[in-house]
Structure formats: structure tokens, C-alpha cells
């Protein structure tokens, strides 16, 4: 086992990329890194820290950086024994390596470095959960490569898996879990996270490999207010839903989906049906935005709200005399214009309601 001094020296070298050095060329510096085993995928390994002071590994492939434990899992999957040792020396949890073992040699090395015999089912879930903390394209792609077809995920508790999925996917969880295989569920899960957080490199990665999931991509763009990705899919004719189906998703999954609601409205979707969908899903901000766009299905909305026991919405819709369409909107459908128009937007009719009923709805 290398001495503590050797481990420290390698850390200092890996951190050296971020410091100016007039005495050696970049080529010679990279040569030193390669000789010291600080080399991965034909490129130097650079060590850095995130805002929480967690150690991260950067390479040209992982240019956004990946957490040390994630790097260990990838090194184990690749049977890169030198890096398994290196990342463990730097403090990676060797038990994380158990999730991606695919050879007996790698298993023996992990045991030698202190790993337990096997992971419990709840430990597998915890590793997935913690790895998901890092929302970048590099990390979401790695999640797919490490976990999607991993046999350890075949036997996890689906109740615990549902909790992880719901944490990120919210009301899309049931739709996602309707898929037959855990592999398909996980692939769509990572893809959905990429769309939700507009991780462009990850979106492109999944798009190139899973053309059959275009409708899922559109569903996520609508549900998570990603008007840029929605527009990209629409203008390239990758959307195979009608405008009202799209509006239904935009209004139902989460509140404050203003950009995608507005986009569907400009395409010609029925704004009264959008209003009723917002009532049904108790999305009050969406409801007021629909009224701003000209929705006037107040009686139908009240009937639906009474059936659901939504007393606050009944109160909102009973004051229809104070509401009127907002005339400040335009017909420009470009995402940049929509984002600019709706930045810090507050529905005119919600403001009118607030003045009549201060404190009833906390926006």
C-alpha cells in the first residue's frame, strides 16, 4: 500500500492543473501525470472540489466533474485496477465498487481494499439515491451506464425505488412505473431527469440511443416546463400528440408550468379545457394563468371543484366577475421570447383575487 506521503503527492499533482506554472510545459506536466497513474480515457485526471467541499474527478469526458465514489464505480466497471486503488487511496468508499463488479479479479481487489462481501438491497438504493445528488450531464449519463442494466437493481424493493423516482418525477411516477422492465423504467428515469433540468449533452445522449422514447421526452418537456426542448422536438416533427393532449400534460403534472402552457396555447390548444385540467389537479397558479389567457369555464370549473372537495377553488371561481383576459401577451412562439415574457410573471387575475381575499391563497 502506498505511503500517506505518496498519496498526498498524487493529490497535489492532480490539483496542479488549476495553478499557473511557468517552469514546465503543459505537455511535460501531462507526462508526469501519466507516469504517476493520473490518467484516464487517454487524458489527465484533474482533482477539484464542489461547493460542499466534496472531492470530484474531472477529465475531458467528465468535464463537469463526477464525485469520487461515482468515479470509483466507473473504474470498477471498467476493471481499471490502478484507478480503483487510486480512488480508494483518496477516500472513495470501496463498498460503492461492489455495485459495478463484473469480474472475480475486481471482486477480490475490492475485498482486499476492505469491501464487505455483498450489498444489502437497501444499500443499493442508498447508493443510487446519493449518486443522484449531482445533477449534471456527465453524472446522469454515468447513472445510466452504471445502474440501468445492473443485476443488483433487479431485486431492489420497488417501494423504495418508487420513492426515489417520485422525488424527481413527481406526478409522472405512475406513468413511468407502468413500464414492464426495471431497465426501461430506469432509462426513462435518467432521460426524464435530463429533460427536467435541461441537461443538453445528456438529452442528446439518450436521444441518439433511444429514438423510441421521443414521446417520453416530449411528455417530460411539457410536464417540467422545458419549452426550449419542447420547441426543438416540435419543429423537427418529433411530437406525435395533438395540441390538447400536450396542454393536458402541461397543466396537470406540476404548478407554475407557464412556458409550456403558453406554448400549447399559441399552437391552438383549448384554453377552457386547460383551465378544467388545472382545477382537477389543484394547480392554482396554472388555473389563474389560464384565466389570464382568456379561459372562462367558471361554472364547469366550480362543479368539478365541488365534486373534488376543493373549497378554495370554488371560492376562486365564484368571483368570476372580477376576472378578465390579460391583453399583454403576444403571438410570438419562439422559446426565448416566451421565457423573457414570463420571467417573474404573476397572473393579473391572481393579483385581483389577492386584493379581494388577502391571505386565502399563498402564492
Curated annotation (Swiss-Prot):
The UniProt induction remark is:
Expressed in the early phase of the viral replicative cycle.
Q: Name one GO biological process term.
A: taxis
The record's section on InterPro entries has:
ASFV_MGF360
User: At which residues are the ANK repeats?
Assistant: 66-98
Q: Which UniProt keywords apply?
A: ANK repeat, Early protein
Quote the function comment for this protein.
Plays a role in virus cell tropism, and may be required for efficient virus replication in macrophages.
Protein's name in the database: Protein MGF 360-19R
Amino acid at each position: 500500500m502506498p505511503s500517506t506521503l505518496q498519496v498526498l503527492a498524487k493529490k497535489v499533482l492532480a490539483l496542479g492543473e488549476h495553478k499557473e506554472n511557468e517552469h514546465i510545459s503543459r505537455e511535460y506536466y501531462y507526462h508526469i501525470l501519466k507516469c504517476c497513474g493520473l490518467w484516464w480515457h487517454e487524458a489527465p485526471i484533474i482533482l477539484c472540489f464542489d461547493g460542499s467541499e466534496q472531492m470530484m474527478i474531472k477529465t475531458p469526458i467528465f468535464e463537469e466533474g463526477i464525485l469520487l465514489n461515482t468515479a470509483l464505480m466507473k473504474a470498477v466497471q471498467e476493471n481499471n485496477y490502478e484507478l480503483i486503488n487510486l480512488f480508494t487511496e483518496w477516500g472513495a468508499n470501496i463498498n460503492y465498487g461492489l455495485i459495478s463488479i463484473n469480474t472475480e479479479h475486481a471482486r477480490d481487489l475490492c475485498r482486499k481494499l476492505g469491501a464487505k462481501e455483498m450489498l444489502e438491497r437497501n444499500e443499493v438504493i442508498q447508493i443510487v439515491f446519493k449518486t443522484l445528488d449531482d445533477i449534471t450531464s456527465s453524472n446522469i449519463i454515468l447513472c445510466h451506464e452504471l445502474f440501468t442494466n445492473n443485476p443488483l437493481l433487479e431485486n431492489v424493493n420497488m417501494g423504495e425505488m418508487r420513492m426515489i423516482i417520485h422525488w424527481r418525477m413527481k406526478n409522472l411516477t405512475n406513468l413511468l412505473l407502468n413500464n414492464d422492465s426495471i431497465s426501461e423504467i430506469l432509462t426513462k428515469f435518467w432521460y426524464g431527469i435530463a429533460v427536467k433540468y435541461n441537461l443538453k449533452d445528456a438529452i442528446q445522449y439518450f436521444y441518439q440511443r433511444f429514438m423510441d422514447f421521443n414521446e417520453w421526452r416530449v411528455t417530460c418537456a411539457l410536464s417540467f416546463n422545458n419549452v426550449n426542448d419542447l420547441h426543438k422536438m416540435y419543429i423537427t416533427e418529433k411530437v406525435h400528440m395533438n395540441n390538447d393532449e400536450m396542454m393536458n400534460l402541461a397543466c396537470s403534472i406540476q404548478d407554475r408550468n407557464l412556458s409550456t402552457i403558453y406554448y400549447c396555447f399559441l399552437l391552438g390548444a383549448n384554453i377552457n379545457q386547460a383551465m378544467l385540467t388545472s382545477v382537477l389537479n389543484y394547480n392554482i397558479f396554472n388555473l389563474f394563468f389560464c384565466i389570464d389567457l382568456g379561459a372562462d369555464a367558471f361554472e364547469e370549473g366550480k362543479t368539478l371543484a365541488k365534486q373534488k372537495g376543493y373549497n378554495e377553488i370554488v371560492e376562486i371561481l365564484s368571483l368570476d366577475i372580477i376576472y378578465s383576459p390579460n391583453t399583454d401577451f403576444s403571438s410570438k412562439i419562439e422559446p426565448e421570447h416566451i421565457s423573457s415574457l414570463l420571467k417573474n410573471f404573476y397572473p393579473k387575475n391572481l393579483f385581483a383575487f389577492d386584493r379581494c381575499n388577502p391571505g386565502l391563497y399563498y402564492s
